[in-house]
Amino acid sequence: MPKAPAREKVLKKKACTFCKESKSGNVSIDYKDTTLLRKYVSDRGKIRARRVTGNCVQHQRDIAVAVKNSREVALLPYVSTAR
């Protein structure tokens, strides 16, 4: 007896939070805003991927630059290893 065809998973695309907020008001990604940046950094200090955060390309790039600048001035930690 033949197998039934597998159902395709429907992936719901996340909307970029910054694009949604920019329509209502001016939103800036600043390296000094560590509470915002910590949402996009894992507990080990790695920058989360776009597919995880749901950001668009431009805002993900802005977050990456802001996190790197924030690390330079010691507001956020660099990537740590588990020991």
UniProtKB/Swiss-Prot annotation:
Q: Mind telling me which Pfam families this protein's record contains? A: Ribosomal_S18
- Give the GO molecular function terms: small ribosomal subunit rRNA binding; structural constituent of ribosome
- Lipoprotein keyword on record: no
Q: Name one GO biological process term.
A: translation
Described function:
Binds as a heterodimer with protein bS6 to the central domain of the 16S rRNA, where it helps stabilize the platform of the 30S subunit.
InterPro entries, per database record: Ribosomal_bS18, Ribosomal_bS18_CS, Ribosomal_bS18_sf
Stored HAMAP family: Ribosomal_bS18
Q: Mind telling me which Gene3D superfamilies this protein's record contains?
A: Ribosomal protein S18
User: SUPFAM superfamilies annotated for this entry?
Assistant: Ribosomal protein S18 (SSF46911)
The similarity comment for this entry is: Belongs to the bacterial ribosomal protein bS18 family.
GO CC annotations on file: cytosolic small ribosomal subunit
* Entries under PROSITE patterns matching the protein: RIBOSOMAL_S18
Q: Assembly and partners?
A: Part of the 30S ribosomal subunit. Forms a tight heterodimer with protein bS6.
What top-level branch of life does the organism fall under? Bacteria
What NCBIfam families would the database entry show? S18
Q: List the disulfide bonds.
A: none
What is the name listed in the Swiss-Prot or TrEMBL entry for this protein? Small ribosomal subunit protein bS18A
Q: Which UniProt keywords apply?
A: Ribonucleoprotein, Ribosomal protein, RNA-binding, rRNA-binding
